[in-house]
Amino acid sequence: MRHKNTLQKGSVRYIIFKEADVWYGVALEFNIVEEGDNPIKVMASLFEAIQGYVETARKLKMRPMPLNQKSDKEYEQLWDKLEEAKTLSKQEEVFSFGYTPFRDIAAAC
C-alpha cells in the first residue's frame, strides 16, 4: 500500500469548528484533537501538536502508517460537507479548514 504522507513530506487535513461553547481543532490523518475557548488559540495549539507529532515520527524513524491514519467517521463527514460547500458562510460553527503541509506548519502559526 502506498501512503500519501511520508517522514520527508506530506500534508494533513484540519478543521477548526465549534460545538456548543467549545472550539475544537482536528488533524484528520493524525487523529489529533485539541479544544479550547478561542478558535485562533485552538488552531495554534493544533498546528503545534501536528509539528510535534511529525518531529517525533522523524526522530523515531517510524513507518508511514501513523502519518496516514483512518480518521473518525464524524470528522470525515464534516470534511466532506465542507468540501462540498466550499464556503464558510453556510458553516458558522466552522472557523477554518484546509490542508497544512509538514514543512510549513511552524510558519502557519
What are these regions (language model features)?
Residues 12-29:
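Short aromatic-glycine-(Arg/Gly/Cys) micro-motifs in beta-strand/loop hairpins
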